[in-house]
């Protein structure tokens, strides 16, 4: 099958960037279809670390085409800065190998202001956003007042769009005794970047359909993870877009038949606030944090850490129609005597084999665990199944049994080549 969708099965930070980079060697095109520069994908090539926020992970391969779809909230200044920082490292990003949908809604300073303002107003009930303006940008898109990339080409249209945008944002700012924004300030902000960003503007949906007819191999690269999905995640502690596989169609404009691959860590992490049934607020969590170097790529915040939650991952598999799994960061568990997997929940005298939608229940769930002996052997950098300890493989097989789909790849380090194939795609 020519098309592959890659999605995260937890709360993000599963290692999707490395897997997209690895699989893109045999692809032609990689498409980002949701989120914004609140996502962070880290790729290590020959000990050089690349941290990507908006750009698809295939941008590091010179012969691949990278596309930012209409489902992405676009911070134009951040994109140009990311392109320029890659050029310093010898990576050439140009309008031949990068295309941006003309329908992308633009993130502006008013969006970042609003997000920070409302996070501050929430006090102890903060969501824990990255303050990148993603949520308010999506709000404006749904409210039909967003400024889109295509609007930058027409002065009259742009002026009308800015008027509509500011009538809303300034009404809120006045109500909260916050300084209003002048139209000239927004126009200047846009004009500073428009010439550079318009070089990449394309009718992405049409180009993707042409590519599909030509038989090109396309990878759709998801950001965040299933339980940050606005509909299916741990609401309200979620992101502002759909992160499950079906969003790849809406966020790119391409209807496709595709293999859907999920990426999951061998344990669980989460950045920010919200329910986390298998979280370990103890020495185990501290060890996972320190060994796994669990700091957010974008926020640089400490990630909360816990045991693998098979209930969550199985639910994510079903939500996205995942047919196979990539399991990452198994090497982080090398030193543990005992390893646990969450296999169910208890609440109010009732057993759950799924994550209930209610936040009031989610935050009180008590995990049910199954224990496994650790392998106490270094696996970092291994590239062959024969090199893997028997107890590690028992752990992998149990996860397969619990989530109901096969694990076909294992990642044993951040490096591009440290991947073990268990099954063919």
UniProtKB/Swiss-Prot annotation:
Cofactor stoichiometry and binding remark: Binds 1 Mg(2+) ion per subunit.
Binding site for GTP: 12-18, 40-42, 303, 329-331, 411-413
Gene Ontology MF, one: magnesium ion binding
Amino acids binding Mg(2+): 13, 40
Protein's UniProt keywords contain Cytoplasm: yes
Disulfide bonds: none
Gene Ontology biological process terms in this record: 'de novo' AMP biosynthetic process; IMP metabolic process
Pfam families for the chain: Adenylsucc_synt
Metabolic or biological pathway, per its Swiss-Prot or TrEMBL entry: Purine metabolism; AMP biosynthesis via de novo pathway; AMP from IMP: step 1/2
CDD domains given in the database record: AdSS (cd03108)
SUPFAM superfamilies: P-loop containing nucleoside triphosphate hydrolases
Known EC number: 6.3.4.4
Catalytic residues identified in the record: 13, 41
Residue stretches in coiled coil: none
One of the record's GO cellular component terms: cytoplasm
Reported cofactor(s): Mg(2+)
UniProt keywords, alphabetically: Cytoplasm, GTP-binding, Ligase, Magnesium, Metal-binding, Nucleotide-binding, Purine biosynthesis
Positions annotated to bind substrate: 297-303
InterPro entries linked to this entry: Adenylosuccin_syn_GTP-bd, Adenylosuccin_syn_Lys_AS, Adenylosuccinate_synth_dom1, Adenylosuccinate_synth_dom2, Adenylosuccinate_synth_dom3, Adenylosuccinate_synthetase, P-loop_NTPase
Residues the entry annotates as binding IMP: 13-16, 38-41, 130, 144, 224, 239, 301
Chief localisation class: cytoplasm
Catalysed reaction equations from the record: IMP + L-aspartate + GTP = N(6)-(1,2-dicarboxyethyl)-AMP + GDP + phosphate + 2 H(+)
Protein family: Belongs to the adenylosuccinate synthetase family.
Subunit structure comment from the entry: Homodimer.
Functional summary from the UniProt entry: Plays an important role in the de novo pathway of purine nucleotide biosynthesis. Catalyzes the first committed step in the biosynthesis of AMP from IMP.
Protein name as it appears in the record: Adenylosuccinate synthetase
Organism, as annotated: Wolbachia pipientis subsp. Culex pipiens (strain wPip)
Name of the gene: purA
């Amino acid at each position: 099958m020519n098309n592959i969708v890659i999605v995260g099965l937890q709360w993000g930070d599963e290692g999707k960037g490395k897997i997209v980079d690895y699989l893109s060697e045999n692809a032609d095109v990689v498409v980002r279809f949701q989120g914004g520069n609140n996502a962070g994908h880290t790729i290590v090539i020959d000990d050089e670390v690349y941290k990507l926020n908006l750009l698809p992970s295939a941008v590091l391969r010179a012969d691949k085409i990278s596309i930012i779809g209409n489902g992405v909230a676009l911070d134009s200044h951040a994109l140009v800065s990311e392109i320029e920082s890659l050029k310093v490292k010898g990576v050439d990003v140009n309008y031949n190998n990068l295309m941006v949908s003309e329908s992308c809604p633009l993130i502006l300073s008013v969006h970042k202001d609003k997000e920070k303002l409302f996070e501050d107003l929430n006090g102890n009930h903060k969501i824990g956003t990255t303050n990148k303006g993603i949520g308010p940008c999506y709000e404006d898109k749904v409210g039909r007042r967003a400024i889109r990339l295509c609007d930058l080409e027409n002065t009259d249209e742009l002026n009308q769009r800015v008027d509509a945008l500011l009538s809303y944002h300034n009404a809120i700012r006045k109500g909260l005794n916050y300084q209003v924004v002048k139209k000239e300030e927004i126009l200047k902000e846009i004009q500073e970047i428009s010439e550079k960003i318009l070089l990449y503007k394309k009718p992405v949906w049409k180009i993707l359909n042409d590519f599909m007819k030509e038989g090109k191999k396309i990878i759709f690269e998801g950001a965040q993870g299933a339980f940050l999905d606005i509909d299916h995640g741990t609401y309200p502690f979620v992101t502002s877009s759909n992160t499950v596989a079906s969003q790849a169609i809406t966020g790119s404009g391409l209807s496709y038949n595709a293999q859907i691959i999920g990426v999951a860590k061998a344990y669980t992490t989460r950045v920010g606030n919200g329910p986390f049934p298998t979280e370990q607020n103890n020495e185990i969590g501290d060890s996972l944090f320190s060994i796994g170097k669990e700091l957010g790529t974008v926020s640089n915040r400490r990630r909360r850490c816990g045991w693998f939650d098979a209930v969550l991952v199985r639910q994510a598999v079903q939500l996205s129609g995942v047919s196979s799994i990539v399991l990452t960061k198994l090497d982080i568990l090398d030193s543990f005597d005992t390893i646990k997997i969450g296999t169910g929940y208890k609440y109010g005298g009732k057993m759950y084999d799924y994550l209930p939608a209610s936040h009031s229940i989610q935050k009180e769930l008590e995990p049910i665990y199954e224990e496994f002996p650790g392998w106490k052997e270094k696996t970092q950098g291994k590239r062959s199944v024969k090199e893997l300890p028997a107890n590690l493989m028992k752990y992998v097989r149990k996860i397969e049994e619990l989530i109901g789909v096969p694990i076909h790849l294992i990642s044993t380090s951040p490096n591009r080549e440290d991947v073990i194939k268990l099954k063919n795609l």
